[in-house]
C-alpha cells in the first residue's frame, strides 16, 4: 500500500466529526497533520522560491473536464426548458380551456392574475429551494445534493402532467418543480466553479447559462411543434420530455468529480488531490496539485478554527461577507431587471401585439439568437473579464431598449391601438429585440452566475449563494406576475422602466463589482479581505506573486474624484 493510500485510510469522516465537535481543526489530527506536512513540503522551500502553480496545457487536454462541467451545467437546461415552454403554454388552446375561465360568450381565457401566478410562482419555488435545498451540498456533497434536487424537480413535473382541469394542481406542481430548480441553480454553478481550472472557470461556469439558452430555444421549438394539436399533447409532451432531461443529468453526475473543496472540508484529502488532478489533467503527485491542495486546506483550516458558519455571519462586515452578499444579491437582481424575462416569458404574447401572424415562429428566432450569442459570452468572459463585459453589456442593452420602447410607443400604432399595427415598426422592434438578446446573452446572462460562484468564502458559500440567487428568483416572480398588468396599463412604455434599470446597472458595476478574471477562489477571497477598490481590481496582484515594490495599501485607497476616474486616459 502506498503512503498516500495509507494516509487516506487514516482520515475517516467519523473522526473528522469528533474533531469538529471539540472545536479543533480538521487538520489538527495526527493523520491529517501528516498529510498536511507532506503537502507543505512541496510548497515550502527557500524564502524566495516561486509558488508552484498548475501549468496551462493545450486546449485538447481540457476536453474531459469541459464535458464533465457541461454535464453539471445541464441543470441550466432544465430551467431554460421551463422558461421556453411556459411562454407557449399560456397561449395554447387546450391549456387555456383546462386551466382558464370562460367569458359570457363561452370563449375561454386566462385572466391576468391567473396567468401571472402560473408563470411566476415557479420563481417563488426556486427562491425557497435555493435557500433550503442548497444546504444539501454542504451536508452530503455537491453531487449528491444535485441528484436529490433533480428528483424533487421530477415530482413537481409529475404533478403538473397529472393535472386535468384544476389550475391550482398545476400551480402546486410548478412550486414543487421550482424547489428543485432553485437547488440546481445554486449547486450547479457552485460545483463547476470548484472543479474547473482557474483559467477556464469563467468559461465553464458560463456553460450553465449556455444550457439555459439551449433549454429556452428547444422549449420554443417544442411548443411550435405541438401547437397544432387540439388536445393535451400541446403541453403534456413538452412536460413529459422533462423526465429525459432529469435522467440525463442524474446519469451525468456519476462521471463528474466531487468538489475538492468539499472533500478537503470533510477530511478526504486523497480524494481532493485526485479531483484536482483529474480536472487539471496532471498526475496526482504533481507538485502543483499538492500546492493547490495546500492552499485549499489552509482556507478550510482557518474556517474550521472559526467554528460553524451561521446565517447571522452573512451580515457581518468583518471579512467583507456582508459587502459580498449585497453585491451578489444586487448582481442577480439586476440580471432580472435587464428585462430579459419580459421577452422570454411573454415573447409569444409580445409578438402578437406587433401584428405577427405566427408569434411562435418569432419566439424561435429569439431563442436562436439567445443560444448562439451565449457562445460569444463564453469566450468574452475570460478574454475581457467580468467587469468590462458587464459594463459594455449594460451600455449596449440601454441603447437597444431605448429604440425598442420608442418605436413601440410612437410608431407601432400610427392610427391608434384599435387599428392595424405598422409592419415596418413591428419589424424594427423585432430586430432590436434580437440585438438586445445578443447583448444580454453575451454579458449579463452568464456573468452574474460566474461572479456569484467565485465571490464567497467556502464556509458561507452555499448560504450566501442561495440568498443571492433567491434575489434573482424574487425579481423573476415580480416581473413574471406584474408584467401582464403593467403592459396592459402602459404597454411599450414598460421598456423605459428597464432602460432606467440598465443605466443604474452601469454605474453600480463601475463602482462596486471587482474584476476576478484569472484568480483562484482563495485569491478572490484575499482580494475582498484586503478591501481592494473595484476600479483598481484588474491591477491587483495576489500575495504569492507580488514583488518587493508592490503597494497593497494603494489598491484600497483612491483620492481621485469619480469624474476623473471615469474619463481618465491613464
UniProtKB/Swiss-Prot annotation:
Major location (coarse): membrane
Regions that span the bilayer: 61-81, 117-137, 144-164, 175-195, 202-222, 237-257, 341-357, 364-381, 389-409, 432-452, 470-490, 492-512
Position of the signal peptide: none
Disulfide bonds: none
Gene3D superfamilies registered for this protein in UniProt: MFS general substrate transporter like domains
Cytoplasmic compartment spans: 1-60, 138-143, 196-201, 258-340, 382-388, 453-469, 513-570
UniProtKB keywords: Glycoprotein, Isopeptide bond, Membrane, Repeat, Sugar transport, Transmembrane, Transmembrane helix, Transport, Ubl conjugation
Membrane topology designation: Multi-pass membrane protein
GO terms assigned for molecular function: carbohydrate:proton symporter activity; D-glucose transmembrane transporter activity; fructose transmembrane transporter activity; mannose transmembrane transporter activity
Gene Ontology cellular-component annotations: cell periphery; mitochondrial membrane; mitochondrion; plasma membrane
Family annotation (SUPFAM superfamilies): MFS general substrate transporter
Glycan-linked positions: 91, 228
Membrane topology (Extracellular): 82-116, 165-174, 223-236, 358-363, 410-431, 491
Compartment(s): Membrane
Cross-link (Glycyl lysine isopeptide (Lys-Gly) (interchain with G-Cter in ubiquitin)) at residue(s): 560
InterPro entries: MFS_dom, MFS_sugar_transport-like, MFS_Sugar_Transporters, MFS_trans_sf, Sugar/inositol_transpt, Sugar_transporter_CS
One GO process term, biological-process aspect: hexose transmembrane transport
Entry function: High-affinity glucose transporter.
Similarity section: Belongs to the major facilitator superfamily. Sugar transporter (TC 2.A.1.1) family.
Protein name, UniProt field: High-affinity hexose transporter HXT6
Amino acid at each position: 500500500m502506498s503512503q498516500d493510500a495509507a494516509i487516506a485510510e487514516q482520515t475517516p469522516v467519523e473522526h473528522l466529526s469528533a474533531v469538529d465537535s471539540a472545536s479543533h481543526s480538521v487538520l489538527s489530527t495526527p493523520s491529517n497533520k501528516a498529510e498536511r506536512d507532506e503537502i507543505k513540503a512541496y510548497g515550502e522551500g527557500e524564502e524566495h522560491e516561486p509558488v508552484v502553480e498548475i501549468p496551462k496545457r493545450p486546449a485538447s487536454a481540457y476536453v474531459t473536464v469541459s464535458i464533465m462541467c457541461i454535464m453539471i451545467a445541464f441543470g441550466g437546461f432544465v430551467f431554460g426548458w421551463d422558461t421556453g415552454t411556459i411562454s407557449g403554454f399560456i397561449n395554447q388552446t387546450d391549456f387555456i380551456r383546462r386551466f382558464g375561465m370562460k367569458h359570457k360568450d363561452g370563449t375561454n381565457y386566462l385572466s391576468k392574475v391567473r396567468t401571472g401566478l402560473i408563470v411566476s410562482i415557479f420563481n417563488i419555488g426556486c427562491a425557497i429551494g435555493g435557500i433550503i435545498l442548497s444546504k444539501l451540498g454542504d451536508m452530503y456533497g455537491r453531487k449528491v445534493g444535485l441528484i436529490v434536487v433533480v428528483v424533487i424537480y421530477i415530482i413537481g413535473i409529475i404533478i403538473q402532467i397529472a393535472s386535468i382541469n384544476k389550475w391550482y394542481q398545476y400551480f402546486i406542481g410548478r412550486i414543487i418543480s421550482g424547489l428543485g430548480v432553485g437547488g440546481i441553480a445554486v449547486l450547479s454553478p457552485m460545483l463547476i466553479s470548484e472543479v474547473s481550472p482557474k483559467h477556464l472557470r469563467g468559461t465553464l461556469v458560463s456553460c450553465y447559462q449556455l444550457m439555459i439558452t439551449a433549454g429556452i430555444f428547444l422549449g420554443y421549438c417544442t411548443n411550435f411543434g405541438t401547437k397544432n394539436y387540439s388536445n393535451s399533447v400541446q403541453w403534456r409532451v413538452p412536460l413529459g420530455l422533462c423526465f429525459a432531461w432529469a435522467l440525463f443529468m442524474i446519469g451525468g453526475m456519476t462521471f463528474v468529480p466531487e468538489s475538492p473543496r468539499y472533500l478537503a472540508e470533510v477530511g478526504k484529502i486523497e480524494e481532493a488531490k485526485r479531483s484536482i488532478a483529474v480536472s487539471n489533467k496532471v498526475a496526482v503527485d504533481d507538485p502543483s496539485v499538492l500546492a493547490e491542495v495546500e492552499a485549499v486546506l489552509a482556507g478550510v483550516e482557518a474556517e474550521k478554527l472559526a467554528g460553524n458558519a451561521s446565517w447571522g455571519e452573512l451580515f457581518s462586515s468583518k471579512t467583507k461577507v456582508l459587502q459580498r452578499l449585497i453585491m451578489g444579491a444586487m448582481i442577480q437582481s439586476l440580471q432580472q431587471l435587464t428585462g430579459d424575462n419580459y421577452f422570454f416569458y411573454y415573447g409569444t404574447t409580445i409578438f402578437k401585439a406587433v401584428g405577427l401572424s405566427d408569434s411562435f415562429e418569432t419566439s424561435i428566432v429569439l431563442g436562436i439568437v439567445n443560444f448562439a450569442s451565449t457562445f460569444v459570452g463564453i469566450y468574452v468572459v475570460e478574454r475581457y473579464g467580468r467587469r468590462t463585459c458587464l459594463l459594455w453589456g449594460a451600455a449596449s442593452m440601454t441603447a437597444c431598449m431605448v429604440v425598442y420602447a420608442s418605436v413601440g410607443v410612437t410608431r407601432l400604432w400610427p392610427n391608434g391601438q384599435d387599428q392595424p399595427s405598422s409592419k415596418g415598426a413591428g419589424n424594427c422592434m423585432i430586430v432590436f429585440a434580437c440585438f438586445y438578446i445578443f447583448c444580454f446573452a453575451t454579458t449579463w446572462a452568464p456573468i452574474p452566475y460566474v461572479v456569484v460562484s467565485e465571490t464567497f468564502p467556502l464556509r458561507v458559500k452555499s448560504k450566501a449563494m442561495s440568498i443571492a440567487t433567491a434575489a434573482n428568483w424574487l425579481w423573476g416572480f415580480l416581473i413574471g406576475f406584474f408584467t401582464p398588468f403593467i403592459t396592459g396599463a402602459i404597454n411599450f412604455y414598460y421598456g423605459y422602466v428597464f432602460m432606467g434599470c440598465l443605466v443604474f446597472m452601469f454605474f453600480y458595476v463601475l463602482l462596486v463589482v471587482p474584476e476576478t478574471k484569472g484568480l483562484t477562489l482563495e485569491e478572490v477571497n484575499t482580494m475582498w479581505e484586503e478591501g481592494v477598490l473595484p476600479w483598481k481590481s484588474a491591477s491587483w496582484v495576489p500575495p504569492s506573486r507580488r514583488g518587493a515594490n508592490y503597494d497593497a495599501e494603494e489598491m484600497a485607497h483612491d483620492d481621485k474624484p469619480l469624474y476623473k476616474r471615469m474619463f481618465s486616459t491613464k
